[in-house]
Amino acid sequence: MRFSPSLEQGRLLRRYKRFLADIELASGEQMTIHCPNTGSMLNCMREGGQVWFSRSNDPKRKLPGTWEISETPQGRLACVNTGRANALVEEALRAGTITELAGFTALKREVAYGEEGSRIDFRLEFEGAPAYVEVKSVTLGYPDTAVAAFPDAVTQRGAKHLRELAKLARQGVRAVQLYCVNLTGIDAVRPAEEIDTAYAQALRAAVADGVEVLAYGTRLDAEGIVIDRRLPVLLTP
């Protein structure tokens, strides 16, 4: 995925009301940009740190800027636009980069399924046998470790998705939880037990029921982002 045009750079002044951030450009101009992330963004931003944003020319938009990448307190780069994860995964699926899911004959997005009113991110067809793939964007890192964690805030919705996947797996349907790690300097992923114990337990229960868990890392900068490697998932606390 290439950013076109390339991202613009600024300095973070503050994030507030979840969806807003004030930044300062190199010229000294201050502007408010949209923050497309509903999570806590724990450890993936710092006031005074560098941010990169895209700019829309749509005159109907109240805020033309969208926050895309953040410098973390650990000096890493994090793609904070959670909407990028699904596009990155689709790109990687179609390119065959995610080898465990290569060879599908059809791909559908946002398909309704399950008993709790869920929508799966991707339904893939493999010679008549479907695979359901749920995508989560990972940006939480900690100092002195190359292991990222998910989630960065309590997520009942995430636990619901795991329950739905587990039900599919128990019925013999292929079900996959895929973590897209949009954070540099990461070698592995784990559930954030210290933040959401229920989610971590739901993940381990889903695996016991037959849900496949995959994690892929990205290479990212102000020019673009690409999924480039498989990462291990550490399930035990």
Curated annotation (Swiss-Prot):
Pfam families: SfsA, SfsA_N
Record CDD domains: SfsA-like_bacterial (cd22359)
GO molecular function terms attached to this record: DNA binding
InterPro entries (UniProt xref): SfsA (IPR005224), SfsA_C (IPR040452), SfsA_N (IPR041465)
Protein family (similarity comment): Belongs to the SfsA family.
Protein name: Sugar fermentation stimulation protein homolog
Organism: Pseudomonas putida (strain ATCC 47054 / DSM 6125 / CFBP 8728 / NCIMB 11950 / KT2440)
